[in-house]
Amino acid sequence: MELQFLGTGAGQPAKHRNVSSLVLKLLDEINEVWMFDCGEGTQRQILETTIKPRKIKKIFITHLHGDHIFGLPGFLSSRAFQASEEQTDLEIYGPVGIKSYVTNSIRISGSKLPYQIHYHEFDDTSMGKILETDKFIVYAERLAHTIFCMGYRVVQKDLEGTLDAEALRAVGVPFGPLFGKVKNGQDIELEDGTKIFAKDFISEPRKGKIITIIGDTRKTSASVRLAKDADVLVHESTYGKGDERMARNHGHSTNMQAAQIARDAGAKRLLLNHVSARFLGRDCRQMEKDAATIFENVKVVRDLEEVII
């Protein structure tokens, strides 16, 4: 499970940062990639990665400001250029209006998509659990931006315990159907009468990962709820220390406020994203240093950076 940041800038493209988009790679888990936001130039950024567009099965949009959606029609059109046997349907989750935006863009431009898009639109009345699969649950809450904006909490369901094959062989269980029974939690009895209890050879279930992705927002308690005990919190950091008034006026957060959210939520790691173009290398290091006075495990991410979860 990995995050890769396709665009980490705020507002408009800059030489060193593209606008918002990131992907959650779930290739080992479910052989899918999930995208969060798709700002202008996202498809160009994908060319610099190993990401295959056909693997992107779900797109989650935080809000309808241009720096988060202007790359979507282009990406969807380019995704249509794959070989026919590679075409797969796509699901888009986002605020009310995302379907109209995409369908009108495709219609007006005369584009043809040889795959189906299934839309899931949300407003204040439909927050909470928005998706559940065999292995993941996704929750959403409204944040505090200048327009309706959502934050997402991706929860991996607990993983099954692993079978201690060596220990099983050591007590005389031959590899084959009996192994499968024990792995499935069934107790067995060997030919000599020895009873084998599955619980003695299967480890405890492992807790799944929690990834929280916060869209544009002022500091809000909704972010704390979404980030509760998260393994990774991706939080916007448009502004730096001392810019709290400006951040509030424009519906954004500072690095210090993001650190406070991570601390209050009990998150394990904080990745600062959506950084203003005025912050260059030295400034970003200072942003990290300042935020670390509140929450130690913090990093300002860069375009194309990959983070293993």
Curated annotation (Swiss-Prot):
Cofactors (names): Zn(2+)
Note accompanying the cofactor annotation: Binds 2 Zn(2+) ions.
Record-level Gene Ontology MF annotations: 3'-tRNA processing endoribonuclease activity; zinc ion binding
Annotated SUPFAM superfamilies: Metallo-hydrolase/oxidoreductase
Keywords from the named record: Endonuclease, Hydrolase, Metal-binding, Nuclease, tRNA processing, Zinc
EC number: 3.1.26.11
A Pfam short name: Lactamase_B
The UniProt record lists the keyword tRNA processing: yes
Domain of life: Bacteria
Catalytic machinery residues: 67
Residues given in the record as Zn(2+) 1 binding sites: 63, 65, 145, 216
Disulphides: none
InterPro entries the UniProt entry points to: Metallo-B-lactamas (IPR001279), RibonucZ/Hydroxyglut_hydro (IPR036866), RNase_Z/BN (IPR013471)
Catalytic activity: Endonucleolytic cleavage of RNA, removing extra 3' nucleotides from tRNA precursor, generating 3' termini of tRNAs. A 3'-hydroxy group is left at the tRNA terminus and a 5'-phosphoryl group is left at the trailer molecule
Annotated positions binding Zn(2+) 2: 67-68, 216, 274
UniProt keyword annotation of tRNA processing present: yes
Gene3D superfamilies hit by this protein: Ribonuclease Z/Hydroxyacylglutathione hydrolase-like
Subunit structure: Homodimer.
Family: Belongs to the RNase Z family.
Function of the molecule: Zinc phosphodiesterase, which displays some tRNA 3'-processing endonuclease activity. Probably involved in tRNA maturation, by removing a 3'-trailer from precursor tRNA.
Annotated protein name in UniProt: Ribonuclease Z
Organism field: Streptococcus equi subsp. equi (strain 4047)
Lineage: Bacteria, Bacillati, Bacillota, Bacilli, Lactobacillales
